């Protein structure tokens, strides 16, 4: 049989994510805005990699956010999560972040979340 193993989409994403994570590092002054999306929900967290702490988090799985959304996996949900994460970051005094797209293409829900966070006041 063949020498090459077929690599599925998620494995390719994880390879891209590892490659990106070598370059993207969050500090206390400029923490990392990390995005994860599943088939049902979208998650965003702001992480200080020096300490290994999550400073702020938001997801479409949270009951108060989920109740306001018609769908938890739509672009509108991603935009709402982007606005929420930016508001929570401002409350903690965070204005500048490094964007970590998690190996996902910068398109669709990931782009919508990033654009909404920028509009709400986060700088990348």
Curated annotation (Swiss-Prot):
Keyword Ribosomal protein on entry: yes
GO function terms (MF aspect): 5S rRNA binding; structural constituent of ribosome
Gene3D superfamilies in UniProt: 3.30.420.100
Membrane-spanning ranges: none
InterPro entries in UniProt: Ribosomal_uL18_bac-type, Ribosomal_uL18_bac/euk
Biological-process GO terms, alphabetical: translation
Entries under Pfam families matching the protein: Ribosomal_L18p
CC terms in the record's Gene Ontology section: cytosolic large ribosomal subunit
Tree of life domain: Bacteria
Keywords per UniProt: Ribonucleoprotein, Ribosomal protein, RNA-binding, rRNA-binding
HAMAP family to which the protein is assigned, alphabetical: Ribosomal_uL18_B
Family statement: Belongs to the universal ribosomal protein uL18 family.
Function: This is one of the proteins that bind and probably mediate the attachment of the 5S RNA into the large ribosomal subunit, where it forms part of the central protuberance.
Oligomer and partners: Part of the 50S ribosomal subunit; part of the 5S rRNA/L5/L18/L25 subcomplex. Contacts the 5S and 23S rRNAs.
NCBIfam families: L18_bact
Protein name: Large ribosomal subunit protein uL18
Underlying gene: rplR
């Amino acid at each position: 049989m063949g020498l090459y193993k077929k690599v599925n989409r998620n494995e390719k994403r994880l390879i891209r994510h590892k490659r990106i994570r070598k370059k993207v590092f969050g500090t206390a002054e400029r923490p990392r805005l990390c995005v994860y999306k599943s088939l049902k929900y979208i998650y965003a967290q702001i992480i200080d990699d020096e300490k290994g702490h999550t400073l702020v988090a938001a997801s479409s799985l949270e009951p108060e956010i989920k109740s306001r959304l018609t769908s938890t996996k739509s672009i509108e949900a991603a935009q709402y999560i982007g606005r929420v994460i930016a508001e929570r970051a401002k409350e903690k005094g965070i204005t500048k972040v490094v964007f970590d797209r998690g190996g996902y293409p910068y398109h669709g829900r990931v782009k919508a979340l990033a654009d909404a966070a920028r509009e709400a006041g986060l700088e990348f």
